[in-house]
């Protein structure tokens, strides 16, 4: 008992310091939250503290008494985030020109071109024959024979090759990286027109290089003249928490997220090593991540109208610095009900007026309604038509097969088995359910297929498109979401499993093949449910010097057509097509007297359209556009 008391007394004496107070128990070491769930490392025996070390009276280490086992942050990196005690310091990289390889800058009024980045070059430009990037085809030289119509005052002379001027030397290098050898007809005319500061309304065949037609001259000007100084932001009272605005210099509006993503990728490709930072925003994706991406740079912005309006309302984007406004696929945006958003963006926000900016409109078709809209958006514009507006490419061999609905699957399998080109096959259907159903059917028959439609998430769509472009799934079943504007390389066969309700949609869908001078094939499944498109389809086949089946002529003649000037029909979507002559798809400059509508031109209208003839045109009594569905994320298709 006495021994126990002696041992206890000794233990108490050891825990008493010189001032007579007991030492407090040692607190456990602080563990950062991101390390708390990890398995504890083996306990290390701490080295003996030097004799001079003693805890300070406050219990905190002082510079003179800090244990040598604690990590000291070097002064050179003390400002950086080193992740807490014990973490390894991150040394911030510095670059010769102040920007990482692949990115340039603008300093002291000079364009500082960035260093080359081989990883970025492989990603953006690909390699010869990789299947992801399309080269010009065997019929590319035939583009020189395509008729070109230009109207307006003081039209600049076209260019015949990519040269400086009018193209900036930095852009010329990027054009070579992309293996572009000769400008297409629309580029030959649009490059000098835009470089001359003129507004432009351009109409060209699908796959004719419209995107390069506006990107090349805009980027050349930006490379040459540099960025504009953003206006001074007024203090909104939110302090450090207020949203940081971005001020794009060029704005490209397009109807669908796929198309704006494609334009953005082209912009990245040709803005390589420059000070210009392209950005993209669209509906159906996380808006927070898009806002963070905008903070990394937003000089050339590609956007869908709905998402752009959303970001303007949030105070993230200002249009005060816009010098170039591009409306791509303008007719499609109006068809999808985006006119209110477009008018708000152009007329009601802080975008400079029509006299202070340059406005360009590009599309495969320009009906009269679009040309009327252009009056308020463009000033003294030049009207450019390359080839017959709304026509199909002669590089496409068009076939029309009569097949009842119950036999379509069997004929589709026969076509796939007979396919010898080894290229990509695009199958168009009308509904989202049919896209998934037909894709499942093809997979069950041992065909590698994928699908894309409005109900798939953006991640799923991008994955499907990549699988298709790379050849892992060489068959893509798609709704109208992929019908307009998308540049899918190396499509050799387009199959219209379901025919659209008007010939303009037919033109755009088969235009996914036969691009950039390459040859392609289209096969349309036709039956008596498609007689409303029969007569126009015959005319289109004749124009492109294609074979017209006799059964198609007989079925089309069975349908009675009303109206004057050769008649007209009213399609199931309410579109009315008049007979007679003229540019049926609205391809002439309406400023010229007696232009493309003189002989009973085509007019579009939803609800209450009318059968044609004469020179009548305009919206039907129940017309107007369908309700604005916001962004392209709406499942209108």
Curated annotation (Swiss-Prot):
Keywords: ATP-binding, Cytoplasm, Helicase, Hydrolase, Initiation factor, Nucleotide-binding, Protein biosynthesis, RNA-binding. GO terms for biological process: cytoplasmic translational initiation; negative regulation of cytoplasmic translational initiation in response to stress; positive regulation of formation of translation preinitiation complex; regulatory ncRNA-mediated gene silencing; spliceosomal complex disassembly. Residues 191-384 form the Helicase ATP-binding domain. It is found in: Cytoplasm. The keyword DNA damage does not apply. Its main location: cytoplasm. It catalyses: ATP + H2O = ADP + phosphate + H(+). It comes from the Eukaryota. A motif (Q motif) lies at residues 160-188. Residues 15-68, 560-598 are annotated as: Disordered. Residues 15-25 have a biased composition (Polar residues). Residues 395-556 form the Helicase C-terminal domain. Belongs to the DEAD box helicase family. DDX3/DED1 subfamily. PANTHER family: ATP-DEPENDENT RNA HELICASE DBP3. ATP-binding RNA helicase involved in translation initiation. Remodels RNA in response to ADP and ATP concentrations by facilitating disruption, but also formation of RNA duplexes. The Q motif is unique to and characteristic of the DEAD box family of RNA helicases and controls ATP binding and hydrolysis. This is ATP-dependent RNA helicase ded1. It comes from Cryptococcus neoformans var. neoformans serotype D (strain JEC21 / ATCC MYA-565).
């Amino acid at each position: 008992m006495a021994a126990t008391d002696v041992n206890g007394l000794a233990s108490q004496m050891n825990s008493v310091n010189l001032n007579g107070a007991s030492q407090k128990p040692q607190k456990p070491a602080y563990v950062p939250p991101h390390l708390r769930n990890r398995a504890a490392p083996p306990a290390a025996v701490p080295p003996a503290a030097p004799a001079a070390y003693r805890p300070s009276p406050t219990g905190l280490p002082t510079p003179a008494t800090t244990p040598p086992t604690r990590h000291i942050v070097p002064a050179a990196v003390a400002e950086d985030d080193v992740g807490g005690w014990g973490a390894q310091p991150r040394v911030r990289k510095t670059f010769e020109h102040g920007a990482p390889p692949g990115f340039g800058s603008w300093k002291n009024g000079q364009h500082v071109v960035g260093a080359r980045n081989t990883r970025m070059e492989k990603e953006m430009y690909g390699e010869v024959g990789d299947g992801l990037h399309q080269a010009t085809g065997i019929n590319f030289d035939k583009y020189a024979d395509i008729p070109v119509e230009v109207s307006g005052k003081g039209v600049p002379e076209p260019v015949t090759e990519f040269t400086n001027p009018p193209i900036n030397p930095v852009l010329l290098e990027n054009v070579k990286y992309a293996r572009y050898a000769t400008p297409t007809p629309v580029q030959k005319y649009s490059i000098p027109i835009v470089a001359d500061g003129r507004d432009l309304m351009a109409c060209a065949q699908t796959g004719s290089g419209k995107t390069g037609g506006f990107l090349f001259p805009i980027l050349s000007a930006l490379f040459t003249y540099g960025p504009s100084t953003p206006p001074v932001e007024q203090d909104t009272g939110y302090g450090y928490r207020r949203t940081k605005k971005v001020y794009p210099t060029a704005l490209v509006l397009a109807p669908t997220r796929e198309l704006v993503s494609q334009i953005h990728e082209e912009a990245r490709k040709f803005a390589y090593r420059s000070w210009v930072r392209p950005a993209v925003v669209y509906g159906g994706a996380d808006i927070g991540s898009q806002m963070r991406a905008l903070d990394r740079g937003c000089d050339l912005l590609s956007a869908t109208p709905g998402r752009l309006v959303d970001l303007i309302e949030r105070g993230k984007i200002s249009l005060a610095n816009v010098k170039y406004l591009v409306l791509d696929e303008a007719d499609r945006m109006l068809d999808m009900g985006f006119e209110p958003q477009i008018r708000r963006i152009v007329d009601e926000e802080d975008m400079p007026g029509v006299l202070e900016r340059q406005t360009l409109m590009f599309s495969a078709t320009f009906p009269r309604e679009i040309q009327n809209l252009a009056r308020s958006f463009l000033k003294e514009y030049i009207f450019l038509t390359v080839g017959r507006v709304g026509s199909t490419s002669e590089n496409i061999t068009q076939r029309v097969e009569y097949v009842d609905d119950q036999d379509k699957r069997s004929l589709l399998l026969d076509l796939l088995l007979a396919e010898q080109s080894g290229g990509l096959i695009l199958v168009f259907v009308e509904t989202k359910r049919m896209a998934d159903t037909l894709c499942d059917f093809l997979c069950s028959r041992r065909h590698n297929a994928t699908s894309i439609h409005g109900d798939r998430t953006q991640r799923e769509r991008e994955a499907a498109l990549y699988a298709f472009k790379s050849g892992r799934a060489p068959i893509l079943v798609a709704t109208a979401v992929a019908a307009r504007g998308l540049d899918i390389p190396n499509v050799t066969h387009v199959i219209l499993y379901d025919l659209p309700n008007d010939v303009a949609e037919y033109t755009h869908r088969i235009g996914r093949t036969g691009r950039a001078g390459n040859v392609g094939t289209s096969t349309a499944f036709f039956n008596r449910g498609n007689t409303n498109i029969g007569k126009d389809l015959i005319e289109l086949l004749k124009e492109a010097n294609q074979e017209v089946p006799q059964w198609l002529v007989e079925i089309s003649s069975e349908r009675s057509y009303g109206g004057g000037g050769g008649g007209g029909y009213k399609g199931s979507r309410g579109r009315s097509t008049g007979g007679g002559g003229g540019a049926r798809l609205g391809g002439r400059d309406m400023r010229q007297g007696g232009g493309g509508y003189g002989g009973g031109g085509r007019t579009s209208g939803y609800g209450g359209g009318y059968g044609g003839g004469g020179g009548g045109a305009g919206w039907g009594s129940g017309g107007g556009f369908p309700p604005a569905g916001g962004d392209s994320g709406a499942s209108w298709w």
